[in-house]
A protein has these predicted regions:
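Phosphate-group recognition and catalysis centered on beta-loop-alpha active-site segments
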Residues: 1-210
Length: 210
């Protein structure tokens, strides 16, 4: 029997600050099966969790005011990132919410038997940053999203038993190539349905052939 899995996108981001520990803890409490998140790298090489390359959309100063200067997470150290509040953009009740380390989220997941799904943005990481990320994932039950077959191969070469989520272009040839190195039980192929909330999607939508 097929089982529906509930995924918390950036944690429970409709009620809590996205990609923060409160949102991830809520995922556990509310019974989600998977936490989807977005790793990022600070200037000093720490793997944190943040969707945008700039901190400005979700970061606030301690008094709640916006950060006016454009600041890229890769241009500041982890200690510098901790000076900002990542909860106040949503509500005062989430004040003093700091940017989380990926290692802290992996620990939460391990303690609560919930899976972590890594976004495909890691495909743009440098070789050094990707290796740091892979080292963190050693021994975890994390899953990785890949938008290219080449990157999926790289993931499986490193983690032969890892579950791969493929959200790249889907056609018969792509599925054939994936099946050559990813076991059927370890592969999820994402096919978006066309609706208002998926207008931004750049891969082909589901149709009579897919």
């Amino acid at each position: 029997m097929k089982k529906t899995k509930l995924q918390a996108h950036r944690g429970v981001s409709c009620e809590y600050p996205e990609n923060t520990m409160p949102a991830f803890r809520a995922s556990v409490i509310q019974g989600y099966d998977v936490i989807e998140l977005d790793p990022a790298v600070t200037r000093d090489g720490k793997i944190v969790v943040l969707h945008d390359s700039l901190i400005n959309r979700t970061a606030r100063l301690s008094d709640g005011s916006p950060v006016h200067d454009k600041i890229c997470i890769s241009d500041i150290t982890y200690e510098e990132a901790l000076k900002y509040d990542f909860g106040l953009y949503l509500s005062q009740k989430f004040g003093n919410t700091k940017i989380p380390l990926l290692s802290d989220v992996l620990k939460l997941a391990a303690e609560n038997n919930i899976r972590i799904k890594i976004d495909n943005k890691i495909q743009s990481f440098t070789a050094g940053s990707l290796e740091k990320l892979f080292s963190l994932l050693d021994g975890s039950t994390a899953e990785i999203t890949c938008s290219s077959i080449e990157f999926a191969k790289k993931v499986i070469d490193r983690f032969p038993k890892m579950h791969v989520h493929y959200d790249g272009e889907v056609n018969e040839e792509a599925l054939k190539q994936l099946s050559e190195f990813v076991p059927k039980s370890s592969l999820t192929v994402w096919l978006p349905f066309k609706c208002k909330t998926t207008e931004w999607v750049k891969v082909p939508f589901c149709n009579d052939e897919l």
